[in-house]
Amino acid sequence: KAAVLYETGKPLIVEDGIEIPSLQSGQVLVKVAYSGVCRSQLMEVRGNRGEDAYLPHLLGHEGSGWVVETGMEVTKVKPGDKVVLTWIKGEGIDCKGAKYKLGNTTLNSGGVTTFSNYTVVSENRCVILEEEVPMELAALLGCAVPTGAGIVFNTLRPNKDASIAVFGAGGIGLSAILGAKVHECFRIIAVDIEDEKLAMAKEFGATHVINCKTENPVKKIHEITKN
């Protein structure tokens, strides 16, 4: 069973009876436990990114699950392993996206798809999870966390005296705030239009919050940073 995008701007359609393709060398069959819903995927469904050249298309690029079976040459994971599913290419074999069948219709997928009960992915799209990590949280490790925290760790690389402002306290923004907290940044400023998200940002490590519906964020940031 999977959610299929047949036409941009239209709702996904949940289809049953989809045929799982046979594993090729370097591929892994995973039973999906949880999937994140990335903003970029919503944009694709709505058609905000232009026409989808891969219709009908299986979507979802961040999730968690259990390895069911591995193809030839796969050494990174084995059946029973808990894994994160991610669009980010890691270690291991890289393969083309699997093609699924629904009757006579071919359903396309990218390197990973998670809006489904089962998914066939490349070995390099699986990351083994420690047993104690909850599956529902692990799903976010496939995109939101490495995107947000990764910007802080790999691009900004702030020192402890740094002030950081994060606009938008969604999954990526909160992950960036976490990254700034790990770096022990002096000021971590969260900006959003929803008080509920700003409250969560404080739980994640924001030292200051700004609701830009009621305050001028640029002026307020200057006041907070005193420059």
PLM region spans:
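Glycine-rich beta-strand-centered segment in the early N-terminal region that forms part
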Residues: 19-35, 48-92, 130-133
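Residues that mark the start of a beta-strand
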Residues: 1, 27-29, 163, 187
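Residue-level marker of beta-strand positions
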Residues: 62-64, 82, 118, 163, ...
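Adenosine-nucleotide cofactor-binding segment
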Residues: 166-169, 181-227
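Conserved Rossmann-like nucleotide-cofactor binding loop
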Residues: 38, 172, 196
